[in-house]
Amino acid sequence: MEPQDPVKREGRLTPVIVLATLIAAFGSSFQYGYNVATINSPSEFMKDFYNYTYYDRVGEYMNEFYLTLLWSVTVSMFPFGGFLGSLMVGPLVNNLGRKGTLLFNNIFSIVPALLMGFSDLAKSFEMIIVARVLVGICAGLSSNVVPMYLGELAPKNWRGALGVVPQLFITIGILVAQIFGLRSLLANEEGWPILLGLTGIPAVLQLLFLPFFPESPRYLLIQKKDEEAAKRALRRLRGWHDVDAEIEEILEEDRAEKAAGFISVLKLFKMRSLRWQVISIIVLMAGQQLSGVNAIYYYADQIYLSAGVKEDDVQYVTAGTGAVNVLITVCAIFVVELMGRRFLLLLGFSVCFTACCVLTGALAMQDVISWMPYVSIACVISYVIGHALGPSPIPALLVTEIFLQSSRPAAYMVAGTVHWLSNFTVGLVFPFIQVGLGAYSFVIFAVICFLTTVYIFLIIPETKSKTFIEINQIFIKMNKVPGVHPEKEELKEFPPSTARQ
């Protein structure tokens, strides 16, 4: 009898996959969202703390410029730390593994939680600034490693849904920070150190529970060359014993890029066979951050006030906007495998483009037409919905899908660097743009949304329900690499003698 091919099955959601996803996302992605929003509500109390601490040391209060500068540094240290964390992704995931990196990353959450929690007792605002760098590093690592880890755990028919879960927990983190940051809870003179210090709790829980779950089978098989460990991991993840078909698929990926070996960031940019993949992640990550999402939130309070919302009630409306963000991200989990990644990106950026255009007109005319502030509120909510559907969750998922194992860590380093530098740039530049252009500042974001939509329409293929090899073959045709067999797509860059080995 001829040997039969291994039986391929549709993957399913097992308790192991669900729990590993929830623990990784809560322990890591949640903190990213929490620390994005946690210093917004208590900012005035924290500035007072900075001032009183300075007075206790030198006998006089800070001038307005120095206080503003110190606060700007405090805020900007988070994206700066995120940038540093992105640079650490490649070395850590290659040496410690995906799960190992997430466990190591908890250091960058627990230590700053203690620093921020005890900063008031220690009378040191420097502890807060250092802590913001450290939680930024935590966010920079988690925003790249969690999607990579979950993407490599998931069966292909669930990869999209699980790939959106990290973004869901980011939005939940933002919402929880907004709720805890209500003035009646922790955004007050006594409560703000507790509000900042709570970020360490998810890290402690992840440190306790994640060790009981499998490492990425792809990492174990391709990089550690441990087939038995990979089989054990797959059996736990899939819930059945016969995993030979999936092992063979992973080995096929390994053979397809064996000659490539370790791919650095520099090598990533030089490889012709990865040209459109690299350009795509740069465009998507830059488009995600430069599309105006942070500016919308920055402007939201002013828009709510202009519509007649009382100043004390703005915090509740802001939390309501955060709840909408969570709800739509939950919807994205259920529709990403039905509608596909490409459709959600096109829909999301198109909604953001339309919202920015209408918001520009509404802000320009709100002093002339009485009901225009309500149009502005509708635009803010529409923008949040559009961004939560595609631009927020999908780019990180696509980085996992359009790169193979050897190039994935370097790709995440590039994606993370673009993400955090773009985030930092918007935070630094937007206040000046807003002063100079006023309502018309959103025209810039509308243009970026439009250009990103055009790029997605022309270049980005649909990746749902495809294996990593199948997706890579699509890009091989786009990159027009001559004479490369579909299973040797990344070998064009190497001498023939090497490729034949």
From Swiss-Prot:
Binding positions for D-fructose per the UniProt entry: 32, 167, 288, 296-298, 387, 419-420
Residues linked to a glycan: 51
A biological process from GO: dehydroascorbic acid transport
Cellular compartments per GO CC: apical plasma membrane; plasma membrane; sarcolemma
Residue positions where N-acetylmethionine is found in the record: 1
Keyword Transport: yes
CDD domains in alphabetical order: MFS_GLUT_Class2 (cd17432)
UniProtKB keywords: Acetylation, Cell membrane, Glycoprotein, Membrane, Sugar transport, Transmembrane, Transmembrane helix, Transport
Function: Functions as a fructose transporter that has only low activity with other monosaccharides. Can mediate the uptake of deoxyglucose, but with low efficiency. Essential for fructose uptake in the small intestine. Plays a role in the regulation of salt uptake and blood pressure in response to dietary fructose. Required for the development of high blood pressure in response to high dietary fructose intake.
Protein family: Belongs to the major facilitator superfamily. Sugar transporter (TC 2.A.1.1) family. Glucose transporter subfamily.
Designated name of the protein: Solute carrier family 2, facilitated glucose transporter member 5
Name of the gene: SLC2A5
